[in-house]
Amino acid sequence: MRDVQSEKDHRNIPINMVGIKGLKYPIIVMDRTNKRQHTIGTFNLFVDLPKDFRGTHMSRFVEVLDRHNMKVTPKNMESILDDMREALKATVAHVTVDFPYFIRKNAPISGIGSYSSYNCGFISTKNKEFDFILKVEVPVLTVCPCSKEISDRGAHNQRAMVNVQVRMNSLVWIEEIIEMVEDAASAPIFTLLKREDEKFITEVSYDNPRFVEDVSREVVLRFMNDPRISWYRVEVSSQESIHNHEAYACIEKGKSL
């Protein structure tokens, strides 16, 4: 049978990244409370392709992923990348995976429990060195300090999304990232609240107003004081309740204006 993919290509143009995108696959990730958590990952898997190869072997990406028995950890990601490079005779391999991560949270006053979902992901590359980034998206509540200052009654508040990316020297739990981000906001967000909880969150957030600038800086302060975190990028986007636009702030370690 003719192997078209392995034929020589004469256009003399290498390809930086080729592979499969948007593959949904069951995965197991580490969980601080329960040791492991089953979820669904959406994968992008790419390698480089030399200038004289016409095509890559798409089926091998799935074969490599399947061999790892659904385990997706920082350590195992490097093993997946190494296997991809070997199976596809590549120099560079890239894997990104996005997944929902669930945490059991208790309401602040009633103590009633419910699950909260967070969009998380890993970004990994292997060339000569292994690079791994953890990303976590955390919804929080913000109250506008300016609105509070100038108003006789109340202040406008809204949900804000904090998108965090970190490189680590040693393990930082997803739960720890979420806790640091929630602590930097006016108040955390819960899936289930009773009336006494709503009262508490409303009053706590009012007493702790935050601009997007405040939230981004407060998150970064916590990252700077954690020796396990070697690099970070923090983006805060506030869904302004009294405007038809969003407020935005971004801080990245090592990036100048």
UniProtKB/Swiss-Prot annotation:
The record marks 144 as: May be catalytically important. It holds the Pfam family GCHY-1. One of its GO terms (biological process) is tetrahydrofolate biosynthetic process. It comes from the Bacteria. Keywords: Hydrolase. Its EC number is 3.5.4.16. GO terms for molecular function: GTP cyclohydrolase I activity. Pathway: Cofactor biosynthesis; 7,8-dihydroneopterin triphosphate biosynthesis; 7,8-dihydroneopterin triphosphate from GTP: step 1/1. The keyword Cytoplasm does not apply. It catalyses: GTP + H2O = 7,8-dihydroneopterin 3'-triphosphate + formate + H(+). InterPro entries: GTP_cyclohydrolase_FolE2, GTP_cyclohydrolase_FolE2/MptA. Converts GTP to 7,8-dihydroneopterin triphosphate. PANTHER family: GTP CYCLOHYDROLASE MPTA. Belongs to the GTP cyclohydrolase IV family. This is GTP cyclohydrolase FolE2.
